[in-house]
């Protein structure tokens, strides 16, 4: 093996080491991104649950309001009709 071959092999070895280091850093970044996304998915599920509860409660309030309106209307109409 010539001196130039040794230099070339050393250069290739250094390049491979740099790429390995870069891949490790990218892997760590991907792990951090995965953790962040997992946390976001968890938060979205919590907000989705809260929103679902809010929507159900709102619908119940609307139903109660219409029930009260119907009851009060009947409370006025029935005595008026029966007294005639």
Curated annotation (Swiss-Prot):
Stated name of the protein: Thylakoid membrane protein ssr2422
Membrane topology: Single-pass membrane protein
GO cellular component: plasma membrane-derived thylakoid membrane
Cell location: Cellular thylakoid membrane
Keywords: Coiled coil, Membrane, Thylakoid, Transmembrane, Transmembrane helix
TM regions (residue ranges): 61-81
Coiled-coil annotated spans: 3-34
Keyword Transmembrane annotated: yes
Organism in which the protein naturally occurs: Synechocystis sp. (strain ATCC 27184 / PCC 6803 / Kazusa)
């Amino acid at each position: 093996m010539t001196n130039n071959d040794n230099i070339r092999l050393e250069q290739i070895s250094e390049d491979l080491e740099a790429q390995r280091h870069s891949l490790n850093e990218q892997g760590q970044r991907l792990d951090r991104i995965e953790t962040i996304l997992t946390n976001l998915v968890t938060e979205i599920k919590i907000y989705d649950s809260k929103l679902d509860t809010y929507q159900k409660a709102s619908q119940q309030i609307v139903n109660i309001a219409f029930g009260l309106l119907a009851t009060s209307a009947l409370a006025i109409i029935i005595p008026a009709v029966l007294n005639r």
